UniProtKB/Swiss-Prot annotation:
This is Spore germination protein GerT. Involved in spore germination; probably required at the earliest stage of germination. The keyword Disulfide bond does not apply. It is found in: Spore coat. It comes from the Bacteria. The keyword Cell membrane does not apply. The gene is gerT. Induction: Induced in late sporulation stage by sigma K. Repressed by GerE.
Length: 157
């Protein structure tokens, strides 16, 4: 029979008994530390599928702490990309919306010196973007840009 254990890299460090007695908080702290060392301090924002049921926060207020990040929802349909940002009505006069073909910039949110950048899931058109504020949500609607520039790549042997 093949001895799998001799190829297991942690055979001296971990045992089944130790894992059964492990504190879940310590394990979570360890995993977060490793993820942070590999992907950087803001690693959670790099993963599109974070929390399947995110906790909604109250809309941001002008007197809020500068480090507060709004809970931004992004979703797409066949023809459009939607970005929803919870924001209070007082912030509407200060916020400026700009975008490139792949990125949304929310200037003066949460601070004037640091614009919030949101990566879009696909290319969007330069014209035809609409922003609507209703019930504490700023919704930005982009039209998708169809990318028909296809190139064939030769396989070298």
């Amino acid at each position: 029979m093949f001895e799998w254990n001799k190829y297991f890299p942690f055979h001296n460090q971990f045992s089944k008994e130790a894992l059964k007695k492990a504190d879940p908080k310590e394990v979570e702290t360890y995993v977060n530390r490793v993820m942070e060392s590999v992907f950087g301090s803001d690693y959670a924002a790099q993963f599109p599928f974070r929390d399947p049921l995110p906790q909604k926060e109250h809309p941001a207020k002008p007197d809020a702490k500068p480090d507060v990040k709004p809970d931004i929802d992004i979703f797409e349909t066949a023809d459009h990309v939607f970005v929803k940002v919870p924001i209070s009505e007082e912030w509407l006069e200060q916020v400026r919306i700009k975008h490139t073909s792949h990125e949304l910039w929310l200037e003066n949110l949460p601070r004037a010196d640091h614009p919030k950048k949101v990566n879009l899931p696909c290319l969007v058109k330069r014209k035809g973007t609409k922003a609507v504020y209703k019930d504490g949500l700023l919704e930005v609607m982009f039209q998708k840009q169809q990318d028909y520039n296809m190139s064939e790549v030769e396989i070298i042997r």
